[in-house]
Amino acid sequence: MKYQRPKGTADILPSESAKWQYVEEKARELFKKYRYEEMRTPIFESFEVFSRTSGETSDIVTKEMYDFYDKGDRHITLRPEGTAGVVRSFVENKLYGPEVQKPFKTYYMGPMFRYERPQSGRLREFHQIGVEAFGVDNPTLDVEVMAMAVDLLKSFGLNSLRVAVNTLGDLETRNNYRQALIDYLEPFEAELSDDSKERLHKNPLRVLDSKDEKDKEIVANAPSILDYLTEDAQKHFETVKSLLNDLGIEYVIDSNMVRGLDYYNHTIFEIMSDSKAFNGKWTTVCAGGHYSGLVEQLGGPQTPGVGFGLGVERLLLILDAEEDTLPIENPLDVYVVGIGDVTNAVTLKLVQNLRHQGFTADRDYLNRKPKGQFKSANRLNARFTLTIGETELQEQEANLKFMKNGNEISVKLADVENDFASLEKLAVEGE
């Protein structure tokens, strides 16, 4: 029997994992500047955590969730997105309390799961980096989160970005617009896709997000939510636009954008790239927005929030397509060459000692001859080789070679063990 990874998953091998670590560390560095701290939540949650928060008519709930009943007959799902689990933790741990500084800022990283048709940049197990900020109903925080998302993508050298912004308004806005949209769509009901027919009276805003070509034609002339904003919703959106202008962030308004999850209101946004990874077609890499009601749905007090999620696989596809050389290094400082069985123990002690001094060190474990060991040192791009044979062992010395220019010096083992750093310059200069 041939065992293979499940469809829609990927093995991240050591040659690739360094890129992932680089992306994650860059994100952590930026989030720290914005005062966001990491939260780690379970990979699986109760089914209701997502069915209540994502919306009963969303594709995630109706088509894409990996859910099952465990041995205790509990309905469990693998998390399809990061926000709901963070909100559940926020409520369960009473982080809404007055003793916790607001806004409460947190970020997460990890795998998510959706049963979708696998394609480039969209797998069934995929990875997200996301942020959430709770407890402040202020458009300024919406803009800060958007600015942070732009900063993050630009930190990877991505400058050809398209920021699309919309507002879903407040509850009154959505109720008024909902009815207007139903009135517009009902004459076209027979022409709508099956999914859109089902959503027409349950959640007509989701029809705007349909991928069906006929649906797209129909909604092209649909009324705009921007014409139904209440005074408060209009003020919120105008402030967002003004602050984006103040920060010099270019954006376009897309009044048909609704996002794939039902919990958003007020500001929503998507950041797209036209990288050659997507054949020059604008493709969403990062998206998010403002939400109210989500904390209450999971048992907490009324608490607004704002956040975004970024697809790591898509970001890496862009970086690969742009052929950017990522500053990823796992340098080998010293390769210790042992000649003869009698040097086995001292070679092991030397590599351990060098590691304890803060250097990266390695040695041969296959009993290869010196020629083979030097080949390994070359393949591993070792900066130095430290060679010890039976004669050197008797004299408590070793041969230190700077691989870049071939300079060699004889060094005392005691000096290697006590202060290898002082020997580096001597070897480089050949003194």
Swiss-Prot record:
Localization: Cytoplasm
Annotated CDD domains: HisRS-like_core, HisRS_anticodon
Principal subcellular localisation of the protein: cytoplasm
InterPro entries to which the protein is assigned, alphabetical: aa-tRNA-synth_II (IPR006195), aa-tRNA-synth_II/BPL/LPL (IPR045864), Anticodon-bd (IPR004154), Anticodon-bd_dom_sf (IPR036621), His-tRNA-ligase (IPR015807), HisRS-like_core (IPR041715), HisRS/HisZ (IPR004516), HisRS_anticodon (IPR033656)
Keywords, alphabetical: Aminoacyl-tRNA synthetase, ATP-binding, Cytoplasm, Ligase, Nucleotide-binding, Protein biosynthesis
A cellular component annotation (GO) from this entry: cytoplasm
Aminoacyl-tRNA synthetase found in the keyword field: yes
Catalytic activity: tRNA(His) + L-histidine + ATP = L-histidyl-tRNA(His) + AMP + diphosphate + H(+)
Example GO biological process: histidyl-tRNA aminoacylation
Keyword Aminoacyl-tRNA synthetase (UniProt): yes
Enzyme class: ligase
GO molecular function, one term: histidine-tRNA ligase activity
Documented EC number(s): 6.1.1.21
PANTHER family registered for this protein in UniProt: HISTIDINE--TRNA LIGASE, MITOCHONDRIAL-RELATED, HISTIDYL-TRNA SYNTHETASE
Similarity section: Belongs to the class-II aminoacyl-tRNA synthetase family.
Complex formation: Homodimer.
Annotated protein name in UniProt: Histidine--tRNA ligase
Organism of this sequence: Ligilactobacillus salivarius (strain UCC118) (Lactobacillus salivarius)
